[in-house]
Swiss-Prot record:
Residues 432-621 are annotated as: Protease. The active site is at 514, 531, 580. SUPFAM superfamilies: Cysteine proteinases. Protease that catalyzes two essential functions in the SUMO pathway: processing of full-length SMT3 to its mature form and deconjugation of SMT3 from targeted proteins. Has an essential role in the G2/M phase of the cell cycle. This is Ubiquitin-like-specific protease 1. The lineage of its organism: Eukaryota, Fungi, Dikarya, Ascomycota, Saccharomycotina. The modification Phosphothreonine is found at residue 179.
């Protein structure tokens, strides 16, 4: 019995003492294999124990059995440990004993490996037979090993084309018997050289390598590739290896035969251009020459036309230059404006007499001009005197005629009865203005006027004065809150246009506690603000004036209003806090009559009775 069998028995005795200790090293070893050439699209590889490829060596049958023993024991122990985790501790022991019994049976009773038909496997068989037998053992499990499930594959597989890991091989050999084993250093060096040769990257000055291509038909599987592939995968080792899955190459959709790169016209065309060997075909050359000839003929025609045009322009230029020269010569010959035909000598006396006459004429002319200027000045003075006299007459008439008349006893009694009435009856309803007894009682002494009474008086001023418009108190409220869009239809309701008016009156309610007045004088181009409680212009009055100016500009479509003056008009100041509405009505009355605002407090008292009389007599008829 050889030394290998003794070593094997010692290991079995050790495992009888400790049946859970493995017969193989727990360290996984890897080996670098070149890429599969016939299936370049596959990049993932599977790891399994049943698909290990071992290198075939011409050793004795003990070497074969020892390798087989290590392989089967490795898979059986792993299978036993996996089942123990599922079936329990006792089931694991049972599976381990069963597998170890099978292992002993195949080791000592069936000493030689056999095929499925019972024939012995020759030691010098080729790699293809052995690879098929190893594949059949992994699938049919003749030695009682567990099947190789697809779930045993790793989730994250390694790509051996980029990883070169050392190969660790162990053999149970007799001393001095069998083939000499190579040292691990030399095997590693050879593996590294093989991997480097397969995965080497070379750089060339020619980036495409047109002249070095050796191509074949795409999709063809050569015999050399398959033979090299089989030899590379027939190396068996114990441990874990990454295997490329064998997949059928995807065929083209239409099953058309692909043309090699060397035979394609595009590649040959690019190669010729890159190497400078490309020549234009004769057809293209002839067509190009023909097109160039046609272009030359067209150019000749164009040049003939251009020459004729240039000649004509040059002739015209020469003619014009000659004409100009002739004109200049004639002008130089007869350039004098005055031509002396005859000369006459004048004596000194005659010369002095002429000078005297000239001076006399100048003096006479100056006298005439002065007389004309004096007459104009007298006319201006006379016109000025007439204007002053007219103004004096108007003032006298206004002084004699009061704008706020006094009522007779009958009218005064009628107003007093209406103020004393306790029924809230309707006194007037005209032009969308309805006045009741409650509104009428605001005209009593020491009372604030409401917006209905002020609207009535504005309507009275509008009807009694031509080319005048007087809005109600809501006009400026909408203008200040909504801008021009809030009042753009108010002038249309009056059925007139702003450029045909003389004056516009707008009563202004300030914080619902005070009344003021805005006067737009379109003839004088002024916008005035009148307030009976203000001592002068302020920020609020300026804001009101600018709003009214913007309204005039928008209403007239920017034809007028830009050059209007914003002024603060002086008016009599109210001595109390309840006559602001009456003062607004009085300012409107005096402004519509172009009278100066010089009324007094007594006129304000009479103004209440006058407005009441207008309401009772229905002055809006």
């Amino acid at each position: 019995m050889s030394v290998e069998v003794d070593k094997h028995r010692n290991t079995l005795q050790y495992h009888k003492k400790n049946p859970y200790s493995p017969l193989f090293s727990p360290i996984s070893t890897y080996r670098c294999y070149p890429r599969v050439l016939n299936n370049p699209s596959e990049s993932r590889r599977s790891a399994s124990f049943s698909g290990i490829y071992k290198k075939r060596t011409n050793t004795s049958r003990f070497n074969y059995l020892n390798d087989r023993r290590v392989l089967s024991m490795e898979e059986s122990m792993k299978d036993g440990s996996d089942r123990a985790s599922k079936a329990g501790f006792i089931g694991g022991i049972r599976e381990t004993l069963w597998n170890s019994g099978k292992y002993l049976w195949h080791t000592f009773v069936k000493n030689e490996p056999r095929n499925f038909d019972g024939s012995e496997v020759e030691a010098s068989g080729n790699s293809d037979v052995e690879s098929r037998s190893s594949g059949s053992r992994s699938s049919d499990v003749p030695y009682g090993l567990r099947e190789n499930y697809s779930s045993d594959t790793r989730k994250h597989k390694f790509d051996t084309s980029t990883w070169a890991l050392p190969n660790k091989r162990r053999r149970i050999e007799s001393e001095g018997v069998g083939t000499p084993s190579t040292s691990p250093i030399s095997s590693l060096a050879s593996q590294k050289s093989n991997c480097d040769s397969d995965n080497s990257i070379t750089f060339s000055r020619d980036p495409f390598g047109w002249n070095k291509w050796k191509t074949s038909a795409i999709g063809s599987n050569s015999e050399n590739n398959t033979s090299d592939q089989k030899n590379s995968y027939d190396r068996r080792q114990y441990g874990t290896a990454f295997i490329r899955k064998k997949k059928v190459a995807k065929q083209n959709i239409n099953n058309t035969k692909l043309v090699s790169r060397a035979q394609s016209e595009e590649v040959t065309y690019l190669r010729q251009i890159f190497n400078g060997e490309y020549k234009v075909p004769k057809i293209l050359k002839e067509e190009r020459e023909r097109q160039l000839k046609l272009m030359d003929m067209d150019k000749e025609k164009d040049t003939g036309l251009k020459k004729s045009i240039i000649d004509l322009t040059e002739k015209i230029k020469t003619i014009l230059i000659e004409n100009n020269k002739n004109r200049l010569q004639t002008r130089n010959e007869n350039d004098d404006d005055l031509v002396f035909v005859k000369e006459k000598k004048i004596s000194s006396l005659e010369r002095k007499h002429k000078d005297y006459l000239n001076q006399k004429l100048k003096f006479d002319r100056s006298i005439l001009e002065f007389e004309k200027d004096f007459k104009r000045y007298n006319e201006i003075l006379n016109e000025r005197k007439k204007i002053q006299e007219d103004l004096k007459k108007k003032k006298e008439q206004l002084a004699k005629k009061k704008l706020v008349p006094e009522l007779n006893e009958k009218d005064d009694d009628q107003v007093q009865k209406a103020l004393a009435s306790r029924e809230n009856t309707q006194l007037m309803n005209r032009d969308n203005i309805e006045i009741t007894v409650r509104d009428f009682k605001t005209l009593a002494p020491r009372r604030w006027l409401n917006d209905t009474i002020i609207e009535f008086f504005m309507k009275y001023i509008e009807k009694s004065t031509p080319n005048t418009v007087a809005f109600n108190s809501f006009f400026y409220t909408n203008l200040s809150e909504r801008g021009y869009q809030g009042v753009r239809r108010w002038m249309k309701r009056k059925k007139t246009q702003i450029d045909k008016l003389d004056k516009i009156f707008t009563p202004i309610n300030l914080n619902q506690s005070h009344w003021a007045l805005g006067i737009i004088d379109l003839k004088k181009k002024t916008i005035g603000y009148v307030d009976s409680l203000s001592n002068g212009p302020n920020a609020m009055s300026f804001a009101i004036l600018t709003d009214l100016q913007k309204y005039v500009m928008e209403e007239s479509k920017h034809t007028i209003g830009e050059d209007f003056d914003l002024i603060h008009l002086d008016c009599p100041q109210q001595p109390n806090g309840y006559d602001c509405g009456i003062y607004v009505c009085m300012n409107t009355l005096y402004g519509s009559a172009d009278a100066p605002l010089d009324f007094d407090y007594k006129d304000a008292i009479r103004m209440r009775r006058f407005i009441a009389h207008l309401i009772l007599t229905d002055a809006l008829k």
